[in-house]
């Protein structure tokens, strides 16, 4: 982070939901360890009531523009107004649940000195399948030369941002970090009788955005190639045969990062389960399999 700008910019389009926005902002303040390191850019419409922002330990700026903009245009407006070294896309219907989320997120970008990577948190609905709230570096966005295609009305923006990194993983270059224990609860769900809380898209808007996503596959391939030209030029030719973005979403394509306490708790739970199934013999067999 330079002395003249924040490390992280959070871009939050918001309209007509002041109570949700206030709840979100307060949850940020309650959980951040170093709030002076980030800023929040609220992207609002000129025909909406100006947001009332409570006293907060971080900077909040309001970017106002004409009504009727697509979500792609709203995000681009927020990005144009941002100053951070890293950019995170968010919604106003979110509650941040994890203390120290800011330090955990920023720490991940030390993994690769070039910062050409994607980090995402646990939205509690789509989880590791899709980067609902993606975090990208300014270096990466400068390299690919764009942010959000303005054509996307509401959906497929996260798919679009994730897809080049799924392509990289498909050719053996993992640059996506998934943080399952950093929880940004997305409070936009319906209750499914079998699956529980699930995110539900507007089918009419999705029917327009999905073909746009398909049509922009060559754009995303070009972005993946730009990254490979920088970090693994010998793999560039492997991108061209890719034709199905959703087929790339395989287990293991991401680097999963968990705190030590969570890993220990998981190990204890596995040990208890093995003991219940097979007593000490089952526990011993499970341990030897882990060591083999």
Give the label of every model feature segment:
Residues 1-29:
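N-proximal low-complexity "stem/linker" segments adjacent to membrane-targeting elements
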């Amino acid at each position: 982070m330079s002395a003249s700008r924040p490390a992280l910019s959070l871009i939050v389009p918001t309209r007509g939901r002041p109570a949700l926005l206030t709840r979100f902002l307060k949850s940020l303040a309650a959980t951040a360890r170093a709030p002076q390191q980030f800023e929040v850019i609220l992207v609002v419409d000129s025909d909406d009531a100006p947001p009332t922002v409570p006293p907060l330990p971080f900077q909040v700026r309001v970017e106002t523009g004409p009504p009727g903009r697509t979500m792609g245009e709203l995000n681009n407006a927020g990005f144009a107004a941002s100053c951070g070294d890293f950019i995170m896309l968010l919604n106003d219907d979110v509650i941040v649940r994890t203390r120290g989320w800011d330090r955990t997120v920023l720490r991940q970008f030390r993994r690769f000195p070039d910062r050409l990577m994607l980090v995402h948190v646990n939205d509690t609905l789509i989880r590791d399948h899709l980067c609902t709230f993606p975090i990208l570096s300014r270096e990466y966005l400068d390299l690919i030369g764009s942010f959000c295609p303005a054509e996307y009305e509401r959906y497929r923006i996260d798919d679009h941002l994730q897809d080049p990194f799924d392509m990289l993983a498909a050719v053996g270059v993992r640059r996506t970090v998934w943080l399952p224990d950093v929880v940004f609860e997305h409070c936009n769900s319906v209750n499914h009788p079998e699956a529980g809380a699930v995110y539900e898209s507007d089918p009419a808007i999705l029917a327009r955005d999905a073909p746009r996503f398909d049509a922009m596959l060559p754009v995303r391939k070009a972005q993946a190639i730009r990254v490979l030209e920088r970090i693994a030029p010998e793999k560039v030719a492997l991108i061209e045969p890719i034709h199905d973005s959703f087929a790339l979403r395989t287990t293991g394509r991401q680097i999963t990062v968990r705190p030590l306490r969570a890993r220990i708790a998981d190990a204890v739970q596995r040990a208890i389960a093995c003991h219940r199934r097979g007593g000490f013999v089952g526990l011993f067999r499970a341990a030897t399999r882990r060591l083999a």
